[in-house]
Amino acid sequence: MGLNLRKNHPLLKIINNSLIDLPTPSNISAWWNFGSLLGLCLIMQIITGLLLAMHYTADTSLAFASVAHMCRDVQFGWLIRNLHANGASFFFICIYLHIGRGFYYGSYLNKETWNIGVILLLTLMATAFVGYVLPWGQMSFWGATVITNLFSAIPYIGQTLVEWLWGGFSVDNPTLTRFFAFHFLLPFVIAGLTLVHLTFLHETGSNNPLGIPSDCDKIPFHPYYSIKDLLGFALMLIPLITLALFSPNLLGDPENFTPANPLATPPHIKPEWYFLFAYAILRSIPNKLGGVLALAASVLVLFLIPLLHVSKQRSMTFRPLSQILFWTLVADLLILTWVGSQPVEHPFIIIGQLASFAYFAIILILFPVVSALENKILKL
């Protein structure tokens, strides 16, 4: 037997078994592209982020100016910043579609993979939040103030916890310095968790659109899915580069062009678009602690999804009632996202409350009930 380095070398064989000779279902659709797209997003964000960190100064008196300097005086600094800022949006688009795919096709029944995935989402949200504070514009400062303040709703230890988090009695220089440290560290935590996520995935192999075992018909990942992933890369990079070059501030808040001022509150404090659904749920409850719990529950509910699966079928491919419910949930999330961007006044308050109620009702009550009904109708 000739020495096949790819299959025998201690390091190369890990790469080989993950990216080249990996047995993959023959019928997975484009919805299975988002895992590799998320990997691409992560690599891109780490590279652009590293280049930005070389020119950034984490100090309240210099942060805003250092970002402006980067965009004006550093070679291609404007491009690196625009790719990094909009890359975050694409990261979230991909992760939301990836989660939606997992939900639709019952991929959450790979429980370890799913749970690590939810932890990855939480880490990504934390990273994006602390990153948004770094340019030290108005929305950075007030966003940080509002969101960190939520910890003060925790009974007994809340106030102490918030002051410990701030490193003082308000969001100030210590807060900015530690947020920069977190923003530098967390992407590497995400990279580590991604490897754990893949390790668990490769224990069971990928799910497929039919939700049935596919061991009888597997094909090697390379060249079939490596070339398919390259197409996905192109289809994501083209809109990203277009956005970064033609309309880089489309998704940002104009308030952030004003340096942070603790004495002037912006008229509408709101997070980046990818947090608006959770922000709408937070605002829909007229009680601080209740809102914080609902906010946490809006993401943590994902941990419960494998436990709420009562259908005898894995995927929703042949479950039309669950499909209707799924797309209703998608529409509901879009409504929440829109409401989160609107001021707190009639009719947005009641719309937000109804949409928040619908979100939890669909996931926790209607999905299990409808799944049980489908089992009965189909005599499963």
From Swiss-Prot:
Signal peptide: none annotated. A ubiquinone binds at residue 202. Heme b b562 binds at residues 84, 183. Its cofactor is heme b. Binds 2 heme b groups non-covalently. One of its GO terms (cellular component) is respiratory chain complex III. Its main location: mitochondrion. It is a multi-pass membrane protein. The chain crosses the membrane at residues 34-54, 78-99, 114-134, 179-199, 227-247, 289-309, 321-341, 348-368. It comes from the Eukaryota. It is found in: Mitochondrion inner membrane. Heme 1 (or BL or b562) is low-potential and absorbs at about 562 nm, and heme 2 (or BH or b566) is high-potential and absorbs at about 566 nm. Belongs to the cytochrome b family. Component of the ubiquinol-cytochrome c reductase complex (complex III or cytochrome b-c1 complex) that is part of the mitochondrial respiratory chain. The b-c1 complex mediates electron transfer from ubiquinol to cytochrome c. Contributes to the generation of a proton gradient across the mitochondrial membrane that is then used for ATP synthesis. This is Cytochrome b. It comes from Corvus frugilegus (Rook).
